[in-house]
Amino acid sequence: MDLERIYRDAGAYLKGHFLLTSGNHSQFYLQSAKVLEYPQLAGRLADELARIIAAHGVEFDSVCSPALGGILAGYELARAAKKRFIFTERVDKVMTLRRGFEVKKGERFIVCEDIITTGGSALEAANIIKGLGGEVVGFAALANRGFCSLANLKNEAKSNCKLPSDVPLFALGNFEFEIYAPENCPLCASGSQAIKPGSRGN
């Protein structure tokens, strides 16, 4: 599966000067919403992701995604795997489980995002699940931005990956993009202003 071509064809492979959720800057951004707006394509991607997870022998009961970006990817993965789906969301900047969702003791979860960069939001969701007695048996995403190691593609993890090394991460593709701390951003140094994706039509 040529994930880069899928993102480019959907107009989801963006070039510019972007402020990422992590606070870092990047010249490239993957706007997964542009891919997931097509249900048939979203379903095909989720089917392949479910196949990869199953091929690695990871068994799970439910899928959890951090809102907002991970919801469609996680829901489609749960559909493909015929599992339950829940999501976490931020309330006053704190990741929380709401809306009557529950986690059973010993319930096995895949935490699914659309994109994994450093994995910070996915880790927050995982910590909520574990705090409620659940077990996180894997992480998944449509795309990995190259900082965390993938069980199915065997790339090397970088020091800023926040995901635990003993829990497998699965993705359909790996994108190696440079990211910069704001104070060391060459795009800022050239006079460009970082845009938060979604704030100006992106």
Swiss-Prot record:
Q: What is its EC number?
A: 2.4.2.10
Magnesium keyword on record: yes
Under PROSITE patterns, the record lists: PUR_PYR_PR_TRANSFER
EC top class, as a word = transferase
Q: Where does orotate bind?
A: 117, 145
Q: In which pathway does it act?
A: Pyrimidine metabolism; UMP biosynthesis via de novo pathway; UMP from orotate: step 1/2
> A single GO BP annotation from the record?
'de novo' UMP biosynthetic process
State one Pfam family annotation: Pribosyltran
Matching InterPro entries: OPRT, Orotate_PRibTrfase_bac, PRibTrfase_dom, PRTase-like
Q: Please indicate if the UniProt record lists Glycosyltransferase as a keyword.
A: yes
Leader sequence range is none
Q: Keywords assigned by UniProt?
A: Glycosyltransferase, Magnesium, Pyrimidine biosynthesis, Transferase
PANTHER family in UniProt: OROTATE PHOSPHORIBOSYLTRANSFERASE, URIDINE 5'-MONOPHOSPHATE SYNTHASE
Task: Cite the record's note on assembly.
Answer: Homodimer.
Write out the function statement from the record: Catalyzes the transfer of a ribosyl phosphate group from 5-phosphoribose 1-diphosphate to orotate, leading to the formation of orotidine monophosphate (OMP).
The record's listing under HAMAP family reads: PyrE (MF_01208)
Q: Which protein are we looking at?
A: Orotate phosphoribosyltransferase
- Source organism per entry reads Campylobacter curvus (strain 525.92)
Gene that this polypeptide is encoded by: pyrE
